[in-house]
C-alpha cells in the first residue's frame, strides 16, 4: 500500500504531531499502546499508510520525532499516546536551537541530521511503495523552521520523486512568540518554495479566533489549538487512510491543487467545528458543511480569501454523504461566487468522498484552498522582516553561526517574488492580451 513517513520537528511540530497521532489512532481503533480493538474492517484496510504492524496485533506509527532538546520529547513520551511510538524513532539533541534558524539549519541541527536520516531511511526501506513524507513544524522558531527545512531538503535529495507535504505553522500577526520570528519564517519560506510539494499553512491567531468566536472558549490552550489542527490533518489524510468512492493521495492532491510549481501554499478549513469535549448534537447537512468550509471565519490561516481569488480548491467530505448533493452544493457555491474563483481554470473545485466520519460526528468536511490571498500572510512577515533587516537587528545571532547577510537578502527577494506571483495570477484573466484591454477600456466609459 501507499505508505507515508511522518516527521515532526521542534516543539510545535511535536505537539501538533502528537495530537495528530492521537486523533488517527482513535479513528483506526487503536488504544493508547497501539493494540487494535476496533469494530470495522475498514479501519484495518489501509492501516499501513501510517502504521507499521508489529507482533501481537500492535500497530506502530511510522513517525520520526526530532528535536534539539529533550523537553518536548519527554512530554510526548509521557503523554496519552506516548506508548504508541517506536522508542528508536525519538531523535533529539541536548542543546536546543534557541529560536535561532541558523542553529537549526547550519550548526546544531546539521550535527543531528544524519542520525534522523538513518531513521527515515529505515522507515522508508520497510515500505512496499512509499508515497511520500509529511512533516509538522512551525516556521517561527529554530528547530522546526531551521532543522525542519534542512531535513526537507536532505530528504528531497535522497527521494527526489516522492511527495513532500508540510503542515507549517506560520507566525501570526498579533500572537508573536519570539522577536526573531520574521527572520526565521522568511528563511523557511525561502526553503519551502523550492523543496515542498504542498504546504498547508496554519496560523495560531486564526486558530485562537476560531476557538474564541466559534467554540466560545475564553482562554484557549495550545491543546485546543492542536485539536483543531489535528482535525484538519486527519481530514486532509482521510482519503489516504480509508477507501472511498472518490479517492485521492498526496500526489493527486498536488496535481489538482498546484497550477504553478511555486504556488503550493494552501489554506485549510474544517467543518463542523466542535470543541474538544462537546460533540454537536444537531444534525449537520451537506449544504451547512459546504457553507461553513467556504466561510472565511473557518480558515485556519489569517488571510481572508475575499481579498483574493481561488486558483484551485479541494473539498473532502466524510460520512454518509450523497455524491449528487455534494456536486450540487459545490456547483452552487461556484456559481454564486464566481468573482472569488479565477475563470481561467474551469471546474477548479475538486471533491473527494469517504464514507467513514471522524469519531463522534455523523459527517464532516475538510477544505483545502489555493487562494491568492495567502500572499497577505507572506506580505505581513515580509514587512516585519524588512523593518528589522534594514537596521540589521539581531543579525549577529545568525552571522555568528556562519550565515551570510546575502542569504537574508535572497530569502527576502524570493518571498517578495512569491507575493508578486500570487498577485499576478490574481489579476490575470482569460484573454491575457494587453492590447485587448486598451481597446475595451474606452468602451466602458461610453456606456
From Swiss-Prot:
Its cofactor is Mg(2+). SMART domains: Tubulin, Tubulin_C. Its main location: cytoplasm. It is found in: Cytoplasm, Cytoskeleton. Transmembrane segments: none annotated. GTP binds at residues 11, 69, 138, 142-144, 204, 226. GO terms for cellular component: cytoplasm; microtubule. GO terms for molecular function: GTP binding; GTPase activity; metal ion binding; structural constituent of cytoskeleton. Residues 424-447 are annotated as: Disordered. Keywords: Cytoplasm, Cytoskeleton, GTP-binding, Magnesium, Metal-binding, Microtubule, Nucleotide-binding. Mg(2+) binds at residue 69. It holds the Pfam family Tubulin_C. InterPro entries: Beta-tubulin_BS, Beta_tubulin, Tub_FtsZ_C, Tubulin, Tubulin/FtsZ-like_C, Tubulin/FtsZ_2-layer-sand-dom, Tubulin/FtsZ_GTPase_sf, Tubulin_C. Gene3D superfamilies: Helix hairpin bin, Tubulin/FtsZ, C-terminal domain, Tubulin/FtsZ, GTPase domain. GO terms for biological process: microtubule-based process. Residues 432-447 have a biased composition (Acidic residues). Belongs to the tubulin family. Dimer of alpha and beta chains. A typical microtubule is a hollow water-filled tube with an outer diameter of 25 nm and an inner diameter of 15 nM. Alpha-beta heterodimers associate head-to-tail to form protofilaments running lengthwise along the microtubule wall with the beta-tubulin subunit facing the microtubule plus end conferring a structural polarity. Microtubules usually have 13 protofilaments but different protofilament numbers can be found in some organisms and specialized cells. Tubulin is the major constituent of microtubules, a cylinder consisting of laterally associated linear protofilaments composed of alpha- and beta-tubulin heterodimers. Microtubules grow by the addition of GTP-tubulin dimers to the microtubule end, where a stabilizing cap forms. Below the cap, tubulin dimers are in GDP-bound state, owing to GTPase activity of alpha-tubulin. This is Tubulin beta chain. It comes from Cercospora beticola (Sugarbeet leaf spot fungus).
Amino acid at each position: 500500500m501507499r505508505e507515508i513517513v511522518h516527521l515532526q520537528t521542534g516543539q510545535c511540530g511535536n505537539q501538533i504531531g502528537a495530537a495528530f497521532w492521537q486523533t488517527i489512532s482513535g479513528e483506526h481503533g487503536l488504544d493508547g499502546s497501539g493494540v487494535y480493538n476496533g469494530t470495522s474492517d475498514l479501519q484495518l484496510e489501509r492501516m499501513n499508510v501510517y502504521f507499521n504492524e508489529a507482533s501481537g496485533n500492535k500497530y506502530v506509527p511510522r513517525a520520526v520525532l526530532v528535536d534539539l532538546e529533550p523537553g518536548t520529547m519527554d512530554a510526548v513520551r509521557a503523554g496519552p499516546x506516548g506508548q504508541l511510538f517506536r522508542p528508536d524513532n525519538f531523535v533529539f539533541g541536548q542543546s536546543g536551537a534557541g529560536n535561532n534558524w541558523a542553529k537549526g539549519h547550519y550548526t546544531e541541527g546539521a550535527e543531528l541530521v544524519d542520525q534522523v536520516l538513518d531513521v527515515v531511511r529505515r522507515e522508508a526501506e520497510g515500505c512496499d511503495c512509499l508515497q511520500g513524507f509529511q512533516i509538522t513544524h512551525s516556521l517561527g522558531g529554530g528547530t522546526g523552521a531551521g532543522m525542519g527545512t534542512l531535513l526537507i531538503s536532505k530528504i528531497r535529495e535522497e527521494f527526489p520523486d516522492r511527495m513532500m507535504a508540510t503542515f507549517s505553522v506560520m507566525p501570526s500577526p498579533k500572537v508573536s512568540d519570539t522577536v526573531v520570528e520574521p527572520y526565521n519564517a522568511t528563511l523557511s519560506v525561502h526553503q519551502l518554495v523550492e523543496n515542498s510539494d504542498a504546504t498547508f499553512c496554519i496560523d495560531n491567531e486564526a486558530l485562537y479566533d476560531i476557538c474564541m468566536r466559534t467554540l466560545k472558549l475564553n482562554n484557549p490552550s495550545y491543546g485546543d489549538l492542536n485539536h483543531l489542527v489535528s482535525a484538519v490533518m486527519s481530514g486532509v489524510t482521510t482519503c489516504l487512510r480509508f477507501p472511498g468512492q472518490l479517492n485521492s493521495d498526496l500526489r493527486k492532491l498536488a496535481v489538482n491543487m498546484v497550477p504553478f510549481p511555486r504556488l503550493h501554499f494552501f489554506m485549510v478549513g474544517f467543518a463542523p467545528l466542535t470543541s474538544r469535549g462537546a460533540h454537536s448534537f444537531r444534525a449537520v447537512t451537506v449544504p451547512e458543511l459546504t457553507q461553513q468550509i467556504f466561510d472565511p471565519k473557518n480558515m485556519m490561516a489569517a488571510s481572508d480569501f475575499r481579498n483574493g481569488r481561488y486558483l484551485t480548491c479541494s473539498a473532502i467530505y466524510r460520512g454518509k454523504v450523497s455524491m449528487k448533493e455534494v456536486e450540487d452544493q459545490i456547483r452552487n457555491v461556484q456559481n454564486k461566487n464566481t468573482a472569488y474563483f479565477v475563470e481561467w481554470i474551469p471546474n477548479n473545485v475538486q471533491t473527494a468522498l469517504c464514507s467513514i466520519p471522524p469519531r463522534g460526528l455523523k459527517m464532516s468536511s475538510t477544505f483545502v484552498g489555493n487562494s491568492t490571498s495567502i500572499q497577505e500572510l507572506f506580505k505581513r512577515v515580509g514587512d516585519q522582516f524588512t523593518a528589522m533587516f534594514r537596521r540589521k537587528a539581531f543579525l549577529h545571532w545568525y552571522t555568528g553561526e556562519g550565515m551570510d547577510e546575502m542569504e537574508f537578502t535572497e530569502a527576502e527577494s524570493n518571498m517578495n517574488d512569491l507575493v508578486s506571483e500570487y498577485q499576478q495570477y490574481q489579476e490575470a484573466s482569460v484573454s491575457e492580451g494587453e492590447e485587448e484591454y486598451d481597446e475595451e477600456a474606452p468602451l466602458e466609459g461610453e456606456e
